Amino acid sequence: MRGIILALVLTLVGSQKFDIDPGFNSRRSYLYNYEGSMLNGLQDRSLGKAGVRLSSKLEISGLPENAYLLKVRSPQVEEYNGVWPRDPFTRSSKITQVISSCFTRLFKFEYSSGRIGNIYAPEDCPDLCVNIVRGILNMFQMTIKKSQNVYELQEAGIGGICHARYVIQEDRKNSRIYVTRTVDLNNCQEKVQKSIGMAYIYPCPVDVMKERLTKGTTAFSYKLKQSDSGTLITDVSSRQVYQISPFNEPTGVAVMEARQQLTLVEVRSERGSAPDVPMQNYGSLRYRFPAVLPQMPLQLIKTKNPEQRIVETLQHIVLNNQQDFHDDVSYRFLEVVQLCRIANADNLESIWRQVSDKPRYRRWLLSAVSASGTTETLKFLKNRIRNDDLNYIQTLLTVSLTLHLLQADEHTLPIAADLMTSSRIQKNPVLQQVACLGYSSVVNRYCSQTSACPKEALQPIHDLADEAISRGREDKMKLALKCIGNMGEPASLKRILKFLPISSSSAADIPVHIQIDAITALKKIAWKDPKTVQGYLIQILADQSLPPEVRMMACAVIFETRPALALITTIANVAMKESNMQVASFVYSHMKSLSKSRLPFMYNISSACNIALKLLSPKLDSMSYRYSKVIRADTYFDNYRVGATGEIFVVNSPRTMFPSAIISKLMANSAGSVADLVEVGIRVEGLADVIMKRNIPFAEYPTYKQIKELGKALQGWKELPTETPLVSAYLKILGQEVAFININKELLQQVMKTVVEPADRNAAIKRIANQIRNSIAGQWTQPVWMGELRYVVPSCLGLPLEYGSYTTALARAAVSVEGKMTPPLTGDFRLSQLLESTMQIRSDLKPSLYVHTVATMGVNTEYFQHAVEIQGEVQTRMPMKFDAKIDVKLKNLKIETNPCREETEIVVGRHKAFAVSRNIGELGVEKRTSILPEDAPLDVTEEPFQTSERASREHFAMQGPDSMPRKQSHSSREDLRRSTGKRAHKRDICLKMHHIGCQLCFSRRSRDASFIQNTYLHKLIGEHEAKIVLMPVHTDADIDKIQLEIQAGSRAAARIITEVNPESEEEDESSPYEDIQAKLKRILGIDSMFKVANKTRHPKNRPSKKGNTVLAEFGTEPDAKTSSSSSSASSTATSSSSSSASSPNRKKPMDEEENDQVKQARNKDASSSSRSSKSSNSSKRSSSKSSNSSKRSSSSSSSSSSSSRSSSSSSSSSSNSKSSSSSSKSSSSSSRSRSSSKSSSSSSSSSSSSSSKSSSSRSSSSSSKSSSHHSHSHHSGHLNGSSSSSSSSRSVSHHSHEHHSGHLEDDSSSSSSSSVLSKIWGRHEIYQYRFRSAHRQEFPKRKLPGDRATSRYSSTRSSHDTSRAASWPKFLGDIKTPVLAAFLHGISNNKKTGGLQLVVYADTDSVRPRVQVFVTNLTDSSKWKLCADASVRNAHKAVAYVKWGWDCRDYKVSTELVTGRFAGHPAAQVKLEWPKVPSNVRSVVEWFYEFVPGAAFMLGFSERMDKNPSRQARMVVALTSPRTCDVVVKLPDIILYQKAVRLPLSLPVGPRIPASELQPPIWNVFAEAPSAVLENLKARCSVSYNKIKTFNEVKFNYSMPANCYHILVQDCSSELKFLVMMKSAGEATNLKAINIKIGSHEIDMHPVNGQVKLLVDGAESPTANISLISAGASLWIHNENQGFALAAPGHGIDKLYFDGKTITIQVPLWMAGKTCGICGKYDAECEQEYRMPNGYLAKNAVSFGHSWILEEAPCRGACKLHRSFVKLEKTVQLAGVDSKCYSTEPVLRCAKGCSATKTTPVTVGFHCLPADSANSLTDKQMKYDQKSEDMQDTVDAHTTCSCENEECST
């Protein structure tokens, strides 16, 4: 039994676990070795890094109550700045000395069961030392669970309470325990972090952990030893990694790696004693930031005696930046900012007394103080403003910058509020606006850091709002609401509701723009309390009584609150029942734009909008530009987690044709954060009235009173309220409104007065002229602190890891302008004197801008800094020193400036990345290592092959101790340069201008780490530099001046001749025009440009110079490179030229518009045709000569000769022997010229192709039969085919796949099979149709049989071409003198040294306007020229081209715009051709071309791969309706097309007219299109018989009651400019009579015996050949067709036409929303067209028409109808109660004593009362029109009355 018990005891003991919670024995001391290091840099090896290493011995001894003492012995600090891992750490005695001073004393901490409690240290211990101790003790922190070996929990540590995972392994044999603890620093309940400058960046509602830029983790490995006395930690190692990926690239990251190692060395049996020094409790392990953050990690400066340091630094800045920015100016400015943060108010006051009388010192000091943002600097600035020490501009800049850069805390808020309410600020409205907006931003930043915003912070703005609404001050209301919007606090919600009509009845009188501001102020509040805000906004949106603009802004703000599906569905339901089309269009377009969003965090809203859109009508998607819309575009790059969004809100007003408000905003999101970058809004009210206001006294006309009296006869009619003119704009940056402006009526009138005021009385122009005459001189420098972004987290060592970005901008302008007038101006001069004077201006301008940005990552403490810095700077200088002479009378301008004496850097951009180390012990000494060292190893794929000898030699050289010296020999650098060639990039491009002695160069130097990882970060690392430099260039003669002269007008021709031959100036003035013309042609070299002669220039292929500098030099011959891509174009041109007609100068017929695809296909198949058929001998001779000529042209043109031969053979077979021979000679002599310039042959290619097409059909019928089965041509319409065709024509069908509409000409055999016919009649894609030019209709082809048809047609075309060529000169100078001449040249010893000459010819008064521009080199030896020509050839075609090179023949780009028909619709085609362009231009275009398909896809285009002409692009736009068009874009290898593209406005598209009915000349689209579009926008109202079409294009039928005038249309504004009344004329319903009251006239028109009689003011006018003009009223009346036309544009009637049956009225655009009557309001509200005079909507057209009838007094007029409320003649039951009902709107009834002979049913609303209720009141007393509508019923309205016993009232 005893044995059994002993065994059980042993078993239980063996199975029992030791207590594995670590701890220390209070009776012993423990000695540990500690080492911790941090390194910052990229994750790749052999790159520069910076870091620090701390090593020491730790002694831990026990105290009672689980307390222990920690003593840090022998601390050593080492720095690292070099290439990792090559370079070693270096000991820093200075930092060691500083750190040792705080570790000489003891620390105490609490420790129990593996958990660290409170930490105690001496009271004056620096925060840095306490945090380092926290990092050490953090290694002892453990949470052990005895029952689990793997578990997770949220654990407190130095970085906060974060997610930790434990894995425990036990080694019982050796009594060891191994614990692994990993901490996820991205998943923390309470993360220790501090950010500055990020208050306006808010997180996306997505998986934030996945999207973060910075990520971190820590791993701990523990070794524990178990013993009888407990478990002891013997070894701890930790490794922490923080990485930042600026571009969200997986491998493009910068890394901070920290390591810790703790090893137990010795355990002693001794006990610690309590320290004698008082200890302060510093809290737990949680890292604590110091009260004042360390200075910016850009430099370390001494903080003692900041006053002296600030003065010294300011002196250095001012003295070293007089003329230009010094290299260290940004660092010096940042130093002043840092010192100002340290200084107190007394220091700043002392400094101010020293520099207050020095303007330059003041400016730098005020800028630095504004950027400091501390409590002391804010006090200092408040004193300056209170004492009026600053002028207005300084106060404005200082207040704005200070408040927006202020550090918001509980100390700065009261001072900022005091500054805002100071008397100096309150006196000036602009200063008050800036101060209030700035203060509200301070409140926003402060409250974003706290859970509850204090009431005291909001009270100043709330008081402003209360005062504004109590006094009715609109300006204060606007300011208060914008400030509330900036703050974005829910506590302000009650104030906002006071401005909205949903909760305040008095708010209905508040202007609309104030209500809109109140709604936009809810946006930020909705981020904190979305449910409440959404409830108010949906009420506003659903309330149809509110103004549409207010409701639309409510919709916009709702979607900013990220509504759920239910709310979005509610919005769609509101829009579905909406009668206001502006609101419906806005809601629909907003939903549709959101439904297409690609942003991940918008997915829920996007999908909800997709669902809600299905509830709405698709017709809302086709609304025109008159309706409000939301335009939204966003993009997102998932690889980089970055996106951008742009939104434009277009809000239209019913009272204008154009938007009344436009709001545009740009947002960016990256790594789970979103920022509203910029938002701009513009609102316009009543501006059209101010602009269109005429000095016409409408109220003084007699018709004004008549119209006003007639209005009283209408039930409830009121004039439209006068719209208060207002122009407002605002600017938001990062979601905060920083400025806004309101321009009221008075200011608008003042501006308009200044604009329209005669120049002689314009004070502004006089002031400018006087200022120039008195000279302007000054210098201005303004530094601007753009802000800082700082993000700090603790590392496991206890050192802070900081990410930061700092940007500084400095602007400078030195101006000196002197002016002189000849003759001198008097004191009170008139502006007309300037037109007779010669002005000389001498100016010296030196503007410059410097922007410096630094991004850092690393350790930043007050004692040392070890970080990675990326520095970027951009500096621009634009010195301009010139003398100008302006002679307005002679239209001459001459500018002279100095040549390039020295190198001037216009733009310089630099970018560098370094590893930087600084410490407080060595101020001014900075260790820097480039992140990308010069000897960084290459990728293995870039390593060059080395021989064994060289390799061994290099290996031997590396064995020495100095094998990696920082200074290398020249040879080694050369080897390095060769070895690093692939990562170093260098490029220089210079544009030399020898004639002015200058060259403009662009240089780029780049060396990056992309060879390691191809990421944006690696491309950013290294050194980059780009410059644009103006440099002198060597010339034969020293240039003294550069002169630019511009001569306009009639003297331009003489000036050109004088420039070349100065002696001929006198004789030129008396020379005849022909001589001057001949001289100009000779000077410009026109003959050599345009002639097609036997001898042409042979381009020489010069060898290209190898080097990095590419010279594009004016005046020198460019390289004549013949690439493979250009040879195809040359061959096309050559083949077309070789087959030209007998006359070499014959021009291309204007109506021969052959598709270039057909041309290309013909050129391809001509060779096959020549191989399959026998050619004539003449064609062989022609092709042989053409081939030889092509071979001489260039080596790469050989491929074009075969095409030339084949084309020539098919062409020559169509001519007789004589023409064939001459054609051969012509092609032989000119093929060389044409192969290099397609322009020379383009004029004859089309006609020759036509000839070839017709003739080859006779010569190659056999080949056509053989190729008939290859045809793939599809046609629609009627097919007219011939019995045979040439193979060339056949090949056009099956290669180009052209599809024709209308009467399509089939070139194939007419015996097609049924399968082919099924394809023909099938549906075609839009890109398969062929564009048909309109001018073919002007000269149609004649279809005559046989050879006779060809002969007659060719002769007709030839004669037409001859006459057309005679009337269309190649050189415009043959009929016109130049309108402008410009000369640029250098001057040496008062002699001109050549240069450039620009000449412009223009013929704008012709039916076919044309402009020609010639740029020539004035150097005799140069033939370089540039020619440009733009012209309208006829009513349907406009062309333009640019040619340049030797005599304008080397390169060419041309474009063409043609109108015609496409797929049966009117269309326009734009064609762009580039036969030959320089290689650099081609490379840029090819780069841009890569983005075209993607952009087209995003725009909704479909694409199809196809082989199109390689050097041509064309776009066809076909109008399928007034609001839609089809678009086809054909590029060299792709076709993009889209059908039914919506147009923003309607275009005038008439019905399709058959081609046979088109008469020449067809409509001139180029001259009349703009005016036609504008005319189409104007509204028209028409009445014909019983059909009425309103201004809003609503059509309805209405039979007018007899003898009663209706208000057809009138001006309902307060001006009452006109009134048009209409009634039926007699018994005939189709005849009408009208009465017009306008100005001082009353005009009647009525039909009599089939003619229209005209009475003006009661006097009858003759009916034939009438033309009445009333100058006083701007009124015109004349005969038109069978009636009269009236025009009074100044009174609001563009045109009124009346012929007795039809009335048509057209009003101008500015009358939108101002009309009323049966024609409607002209407000685009089609659903609200039946608007009655009282403002309510009628239920049908009949009630609508009746409401606009004018009642007449009994027995005084022909109209016997009047309106009265009626009682329903039956009893109805409502809710079970018998009721009697009365109409809520009046119904037409015959007058008393009259009986109705005709009636019409109308639907009327009724208000019901109980049947037993007494009703003794009259209709007027009851006011039924103000009662609610209980039911609807139909009653009869009287339309015709018989009055035998009419009662006439006295």
Swiss-Prot record:
Biased composition (Basic and acidic residues): 1156-1165, 1338-1350
Biased composition (Basic residues): 1267-1277
Residues annotated as domain Vitellogenin: 24-662
InterPro entries: Lipid_transp_b-sht_shell, Lipovitellin_superhlx_dom, Vitellinogen_b-sht_N, Vitellinogen_b-sht_shell, Vitellinogen_b-sht_shell_sf, Vitellinogen_open_b-sht, Vitellinogen_open_b-sht_sub1, Vitellogenin/Apolipophorin
Tissue: After incorporation from serum via a specific receptor, it is cleaved into four fragments, heavy and light chain lipovitellins, phosphovitin and YGP40, and YGP40 is released into the yolk plasma before or during compartmentation of lipovitellin-phosvitin complex into the yolk granule.
Additional remark text: Vitellogenin II is the most abundant of the three vitellogenins (I, II, and III).
Domain VWFD: 1579-1756
Record protein name field: Vitellogenin-2
Biological process (GO), any one: response to estradiol
Residues covered by region (Disordered): 935-984, 1115-1313, 1338-1362
UniProt PTM: Phosvitin, an egg yolk storage protein, is one of the most highly phosphorylated (10%) proteins in nature.
Coiled coil residues, start to end: none
